A protein has these predicted regions:
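Surface-exposed, low-hydrophobicity beta-strand/loop segments enriched in small/polar/acidic residues
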Residues: 1-100
């Protein structure tokens, strides 16, 4: 069963071997967030690469943005899951990561 963690700023979701199952994000409807999700234990941890490449999401899009096309079993992360978040104009964003 997958767990989840909600972030509103850059940070670690989980440290250690795990599976990434996807994410959703909600915005303030004005300021576009830029998100990168990596196989990394923390800010100074070993980086095994991007799980979700850096992408800017349209804050004016209706509904939630998120990851599609992931394998049903998730993506294996050896080091953990780390999310880098920035928001144009200093707006607000919530990113919920699903993992096991």
């Amino acid at each position: 069963m997958a767990s989840f963690k909600k972030l509103t700023a850059t940070g670690s979701v989980f440290s250690g071997r795990c599976r990434f199952h996807g994410f959703v994000l909600g915005t303030d409807s004005t300021n576009d967030p830029t998100i990168t999700i990596e196989d990394r234990a923390g800010a100074g941890g070993q980086n095994a690469g991007e799980i979700i490449p850096t992408c800017t999401y349209d804050a004016t899009a209706l509904g939630l943005n998120g990851a599609t096309g992931l394998p049903p079993e998730g993506v294996l992360c050896d080091n953990g899951i780390y999310v880098t978040i920035s928001v144009a104009g200093g707006g607000a964003v919530e990113v919920t990561i699903f993992y096991s």
